[in-house]
């Protein structure tokens, strides 16, 4: 085992040190980003539902 227990301890120590250097978003930014993601997901969901319905109607029309 290269490093062993000391290696694992150093790894987690480095992780903690790196997490302290991270620039975390404010609550306001986080809320805004979350709403943007949810809005984008909703838009894409509706878009693909409409496209799916259109293709289904087209195929049904060709079959009948």
Swiss-Prot record:
Keywords: Cell membrane, Membrane, Protein transport, Translocation, Transmembrane, Transmembrane helix, Transport. It is a single-pass membrane protein. Its main location: membrane. Pfam families: SecE. The keyword Membrane applies. PROSITE patterns: SECE_SEC61G. It is found in: Cell membrane. It comes from the Bacteria. One of its GO terms (molecular function) is protein transmembrane transporter activity. GO terms for biological process: intracellular protein transmembrane transport; protein secretion; protein targeting; protein transport by the Sec complex. The keyword Plastid does not apply. GO terms for cellular component: plasma membrane. The chain crosses the membrane at residues 35-55. Belongs to the SecE/SEC61-gamma family. NCBIfam families: secE_bact. Essential subunit of the Sec protein translocation channel SecYEG. Clamps together the 2 halves of SecY. May contact the channel plug during translocation. Component of the Sec protein translocase complex. Heterotrimer consisting of SecY, SecE and SecG subunits. The heterotrimers can form oligomers, although 1 heterotrimer is thought to be able to translocate proteins. Interacts with the ribosome. Interacts with SecDF, and other proteins may be involved. Interacts with SecA. This is Protein translocase subunit SecE. The gene is secE.
């Amino acid at each position: 085992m290269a490093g062993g227990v000391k290696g694992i301890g150093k790894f987690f120590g480095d992780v903690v040190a790196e997490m302290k250097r991270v620039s975390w978003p404010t609550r306001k930014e986080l809320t805004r980003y979350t709403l943007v993601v949810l809005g984008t997901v909703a838009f894409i969901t509706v878009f693909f539902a409409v496209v799916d319905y259109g293709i289904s109607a087209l195929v049904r029309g060709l079959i009948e």
